Amino acid sequence: MKYRFQYIESVPSLPNAAMVRGSFVHRVLELLLARAAQDRTLDAVRKDFEIAEGEFRLRDDFRLLLLDATSEADFWESCRECVRAYYRIEQPATANIVELEKWVSTPLGEFELGGFIDRLERDDRGLVVSDYKTGAPKPLRFSTDYLRQLTYYALMCETQLNETPHSVRIYYLGGGKDEHTRDERVVTQAVTGATLADVRDTARRVFGEIEAGKSSGEFATNVTNLCNWCDFKQWCPAHGGDIAQALSAGTERVALRRREAGLPEKS
């Protein structure tokens, strides 16, 4: 159903602080790790933080948060704490980075699956597909969905790079100061033939369901706790909403926020 709201109905959505913080911290670490290993110093990351902050202050998603002075200060401090957490779990000079923000794709019958890998690294066993999460650490049993998403990228690497990553890995950077050990913050799962087959089959099934939904106009709903964070919940039929109102109401909601932020209306 979320696919329908985003790509069929084209209902615009609003950013939230967690989303923007995640994008910002990714950008800081992208700038840092793009440097030569010996140049990934504390002075460098401070400079990269300033560069990213300058970029984000001009971005619509940051401006649409409408942060007051106190909330803005809290936002930047939460970003700094995520970067500090990164340094508590990894010395950046030791990271063997293969690619950052690399586009990969793979054909699946008549469909194509593609996306950007945030961080592709190499250790003594081979490639690892990695990502950062700026939320609090979750144990392996509760990180399944995140790791599954990364396994799709491992599948794409197998096709495009002719090398299958041996693991997928999440670096959790949220959750406060010194409250979590490195083992809690770095969660790794092996990539196996079974996990690759599982995501391949799932992708084909989902693509088939999307095509069927496009033809019939009917998209299945999947009610979970994540619905509470969905920007389209108020219009979702599973929650008593009216899809017919979504585009006009969503467009007006975003237009109002843009006016409040002093941004020009989108054509």
What function would you assign to each model-found segment?
Residues M1-L31, S267:
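Charged, glycine-rich intrinsically disordered N-terminal tails and low-complexity linkers that flank
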Residues E9-A18, R35-R40, P139-F142, G217-F219:
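Short, polar/flexible loop-turn hinges at active-site or ligand-entry regions and domain interfaces
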Residues Q6-S13, L64-L65, Y132-P139:
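Glycine- and acidic
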Residues V98, K102-V199:
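Mg2+/Mn2+-dependent nuclease catalytic core
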